[in-house]
Amino acid sequence: MKKIVLAALILASMFCNAQETNETRKFEPYVNQLGYNLNESKRFVCYGAEDGTSFKITNTATSKIVFEGEILNNEGWFSDFNPDGIADEFIITADGHGSSVPFLIADHLLETTSSKLAYDFFVDARGFSDLSTYDMAAVYGGGPTRDGGAYGLETIFEILQYASNPALFDNWKSELGDKKVADLIELILWHAEFAYKYVDYNGPVKKRHGTLGYQGQPRMTYDYWNTLDQLAAVCAAYHSFLKPYLDEETYQKYRKACLDNWEAYDRHKVVRFWTYSTKWVDQGFQEFNEMGNAYGQSVFRNLLMYECERHEKDGSPEKFLKWAQAGASDIIKNWDFENPRHMWWIRNAEHITPQALSFFLLLAPEKAPKETKEKLEAWALHMKQKTNNFWKYRTHSESEWAHPKTKELGGAPALGGSMFAVAHLLNDPELRALGWAQTDFVFGVNPVGTHLSNKSDDRVKIGGYWPGVEKGWPQSHPNGFGELGKVRGTLDGSPLDSQFPIAETVETIEGKNEGRVFGKNAYATEGWGISNRGWQATLTFSTLGSHSLKVLDSESTTEISEVKPGQTVNILLKAALNVDRNTKDKGWVLLKTGEQTENIALTETGINTGIFTAKFKIPKNTDVNILELSYGFLGFEQSLTLNVQH
């Protein structure tokens, strides 16, 4: 029965042919083709549906209608629909508009399905694997990530991704073919060694799209500065989770490289007018840009060095904190939401600004400038105003949805992460819902009605595509500078201004890009490492607000904060660890007793519950007064203390 229903759905939701127009075509409901997280915002778009049009949600396994509602302003909402038990597939049918493709609703569906693909991209997209033989003169064809230099900041966001949900990544250690990097920790260490090996490299390389440097000063040919930014993240992570994998001698080499070059490479301050671009989309001097000089990057790097240095006996944390505070104050004073060169114009790097301010409040809230939260509140209000449309898409202006030629991919895929981070800090459920709308946009709730990644046979064969997503981006550019055709998890395209409010026709072009077509048809912008970095950030910050840690009494009836020696308690963690919805998954938390830290294993309470527990007996002979439990690192911690009553 299910196969029949699915076949009917596929036929009902096929792309329209070239002869159809907006006047004749009835657009089907566009849903998040992967599905929706339990207990989070859920919505779809049915373009052209009149207000009041009824819609129904049907369970494809039982053929039963499980939810009903009405469409308003082309949107249908079903946030209150949170089915229990094993995840089933559903479809949405709107009167007169046919049916959607099937989708799931499950615990932490986005994170558990997408997080591995997010770092798999950086495993596959490396320009080389052997650091001893690589020729840096070809950096634009290789580098740590192909089609990019050291400015990609991959290591920073790989480290934040691990810190946000570490037990999830510890379960993924399989390799692909002859790739030498298997898991996220190994990938981080590979990028760290790259950054150290080429910390002072400064060209020459192939010249593309302009030159780098301060306005009025000699031009640089390679972004060597940002190797230090990546090493700073490694040095910070050493003290939280990298010690078992990184020997102290190597760590101290990385730290010394940062300390010796930090001010010489202008890492201590905000850098403006740093590149002169000849690219048609952003010609001229750029105050900030996507190539390693994002507004807010100074906050990230100096906070990470502060975190490193505060653990060292001979450290100098205060100067890095001062520089981080100066960078944050600069953002608070000068970040202009109406200046496109501070916002969408810098495309793939735009997400760094709000995320850097948010990171300050996560990592060291008492040290952040006092106006930090107020600036983020202003940004949140601006975003709500700019997304006041049925796509929930952040528009460019009153007359333009998106760029007429290219938006690259730094908009919706990365914007969700910024919204998640700020919504968590402001306790703003409306902004969090907008963050989920951005992820829906990535998975098909957009004018083209497809995922932003091309579903090629090559990617499917290597496990490089999202399971259950039927319609991928219709065009790919597999053999560009990034050579991303066989790279897992690549994002390939994003709607142009001409595709809004709806794409009239969508032409599928397999395996090639016949130039960049700026008309009505969708086109592939060509994936890029920096684009996927923003998507990685969204998956990182989405965990804020959905993870929780509690300790209950032995009967699991009451939450407690005081315990006695010899008492048995239940530790309860809710986190994005429910990878296999047919078995009980595993997790862990850290228990700190005085100077000792141990790992406590957790098991899911049942199949597909997403809640992980363990019974723990307080040692009878303990003489400490406080036990500390935590999950996560670097500001992403869920933590609590237990007072031991002797």
Mark where each language-model region is.
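Aromatic sugar-binding surface patches on proteins
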Residues: L72-F81, E604-D623
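Low-complexity, Pro/Ser/Thr- and charge-rich linker/hinge segments at domain boundaries
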Residues: T21-F27, N39, S100-L131, H646
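Short, compositionally biased P/S/T/A/G/V-rich stretches that sit at domain boundaries
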Residues: E23-L34, S546-K564
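Aromatic/hydrophobic beta-strand junction motif of beta-rich domains
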Residues: R43-G48, V569-L577
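Hydrophobic h-region of N-terminal signal peptides that target proteins for export
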Residues: L9-N17
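Aromatic (Trp/Tyr) and acidic
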Residues: Q33-H97, G127-L153, L160-Q161, Y214-P244, ...
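Extended ligand-binding groove/face enriched in aromatic
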Residues: T112-S329, K333-M343
